């Protein structure tokens, strides 16, 4: 879709709203185990296999996610 660009998070923990912004921009990023405030962000490869996941509340969650998005994120077109 036109207008989608790379989305980069701050290096620390991230909010649900920030998570939604990322899953809107990338087609292989998902939210998992969503009981409310604490959830996991998951990146899958083209075959659907999990490549990475972390909890949104981890101290370096954004830093880890940014690195995985740079190497394996599939932007929506």
Curated annotation (Swiss-Prot):
Query: Which Gene3D superfamilies does the entry link to?
Result: ykff protein like domains
Q: Output the SUPFAM superfamilies linked to this UniProt entry.
A: YcfA/nrd intein domain (SSF54786)
Which superkingdom? Bacteria
**UniProt family annotation:** Belongs to the UPF0401 family.
According to UniProt, the name of this protein is UPF0401 protein c3666
């Amino acid at each position: 879709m036109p207008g989608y660009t790379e989305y980069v998070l701050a290096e620390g923990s991230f909010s649900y709203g920030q998570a939604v912004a990322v899953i809107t921009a990338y087609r292989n990023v998902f939210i998992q185990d969503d009981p409310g405030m604490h959830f996991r962000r998951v990146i899958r490869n083209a075959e659907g296999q999990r490549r990475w996941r972390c909890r949104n509340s981890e101290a370096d969650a954004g830093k880890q996610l940014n690195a995985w998005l740079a190497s394996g994120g599939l932007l929506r077109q």
